[in-house]
Structure formats: structure tokens, C-alpha cells
């Protein structure tokens, strides 16, 4: 047992009760030792991850790193929502899927991947699109939403459902070499409609098919979204509420812009 594991377990076995909100089992103390020894993290933050229910809308480019990192981090329950199937052209950036998954529903492929990575979590695949008929029912049972979609109709719907239910939402988007992300937390900061009051003109934003997508920037932004999710779920750090983080893969680093709720 290395030093980090020894410090995490503190030399004692934990109560073996996954349903308990007061203890981690010894297996978890070992698996998540590098989290637990972090300053400001500890067993309490890890327990919060274990007890969290997270809805990930979209199991494509952004959904791939989001799902992999949240499952590895120890989120206890993941709902994966996507109505699309894996296409070979997806594999350049949608790293949760394999060649053998081509033609399979993305939600099912992603569920298999996260359970291979962490067999101790519960993963639910929902092969459907977020719509007016299911949005509130899906969102209300979760502690956090991650919007990994690629169209404004679904983005507005996810944000509106988050606002109605009071559920925080981590949002991200990719355009060629660039990405953006933010956290929309009802009653704590502005929402998506404050940032984008109107849908951008259809011809102003090229699709991935037409304009292309730089694979590594998808991983960058998706990993940052997973970081924001962990901050929201555990209470560590400062989530990007009221902040728009802009990543330019051809430059160096990222820049952060502030925005506020529309007074109207």
C-alpha cells in the first residue's frame, strides 16, 4: 500500500455499506485515494460524488470525456441520454466509442464503456432525444445536468428544464478549433438565455460536417466540463457561474469572460 492510500484509509477499514451517507467502503478509500488526500477534498467530497445522480445529455464528442472522467471520479449514478448511433466518422473525437461500436446506439456504447471503467457505479442508458415530453421528468431526478449537445433547440430545452427544477447545469460547445463552457445554476447566476437571448442564424455557425472539429479541443473542453461538474457536486472550488470560458486550441490557455442575467 503506497503512502497516498495509507493516508486515505487512515489505517482503518470503513463500514461496508454503499447506501450509507456517512462512510466509504475500504475499496473506495483505495480506489479514490488520490482524490481523498487532496487538500480540501477528503472523504466528504468523495462521498458526495458517490451519492450524486448526474444526467449527461449527449454521448458524443463532449459527452465522451465528461462520462469517462465522471465515472472514473466515482459519481454513483449516471444517466446517459442520446438518440444517435455511432458512426465511423465520430471516432476521431468521440473517444468513448470503439470501432466495434459503429452502428450501435451511443447511449448503450457509452454505458458499456463507463461500466468497464468503473463497475461499481450505476449507469442507465436512455436511447432518446431530450424533448418537451420528457425533459422535466428526466431532469427532476438528478443533482446535475451536463449539456453535451450540438444544437440550440436542445440546449435551450435543457437550460429551461434546469431553471424550472432548480438543477445546476454544466454547458459546453465546440466550433472547429474553439470551445466554450459555463455553469448555469438557477437562483445563483445567469442562464443560457441570458448568454444567448436568440438562436444564432443558421448560416453563422457551420456544422461539424461542413466546418470540421479539432479532436483534441473536444477533450480539453469536455475535461473542463467534468471539472466544473465535480466542483458543483462536491462544493470544492468556485464553479464558472456567470463566466464564459473560451478555449482556443491554436492559441495558449483559455480566457474567461463575465456575463450577467438579463434584467428583462
How should these model regions be labeled?
Residues 1-264:
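Adenine nucleotide-associated cytosolic modules
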Amino acid at each position: 500500500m503506497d503512502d497516498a492510500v495509507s493516508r486515505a484509509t487512515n489505517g482503518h477499514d470503513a463500514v461496508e455499506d454503499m447506501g450509507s451517507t456517512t462512510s466509504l467502503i475500504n475499496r473506495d478509500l483505495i480506489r479514490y485515494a488520490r482524490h481523498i488526500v487532496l487538500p480540501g477534498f477528503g472523504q466528504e467530497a468523495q462521498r458526495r460524488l458517490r451519492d450524486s445522480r448526474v444526467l449527461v445529455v449527449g454521448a458524443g464528442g463532449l459527452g465522451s470525456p465528461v462520462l469517462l472522467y465522471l465515472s472514473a471520479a466515482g459519481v454513483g449514478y449516471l444517466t446517459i441520454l442520446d438518440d444517435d448511433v455511432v458512426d465511423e466518422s465520430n471516432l476521431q473525437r468521440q473517444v468513448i466509442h470503439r470501432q466495434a461500436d459503429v452502428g450501435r446506439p451511443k447511449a448503450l456504447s457509452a454505458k458499456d464503456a463507463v461500466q468497464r471503467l468503473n463497475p461499481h457505479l450505476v449507469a442507465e442508458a436512455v436511447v432518446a432525444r431530450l424533448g418537451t415530453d420528457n425533459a422535466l421528468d428526466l431532469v427532476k431526478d438528478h443533482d446535475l445536468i451536463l449539456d453535451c449537445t450540438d444544437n440550440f433547440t436542445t440546449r435551450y430545452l435543457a437550460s429551461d428544464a434546469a431553471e424550472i427544477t432548480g438543477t445546476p447545469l454544466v454547458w459546453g460547445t465546440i466550433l472547429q478549433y474553439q470551445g466554450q463552457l459555463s455553469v448555469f445554476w438557477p437562483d445563483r447566476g445567469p442562464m443560457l438565455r441570458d448568454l444567448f437571448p436568440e438562436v444564432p442564424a443558421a448560416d453563422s455557425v457551420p456544422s461539424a460536417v461542413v466546418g470540421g472539429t479539432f479532436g483534441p479541443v473536444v477533450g480539453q473542453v469536455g475535461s473542463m466540463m467534468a471539472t466544473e461538474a465535480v466542483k458543483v457536486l462536491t462544493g470544492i472550488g468556485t464553479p464558472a457561474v456567470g463566466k464564459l470560458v473560451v478555449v482556443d486550441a491554436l492559441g495558449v490557455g483559455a480566457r474567461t469572460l463575465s456575463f450577467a442575467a438579463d434584467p428583462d
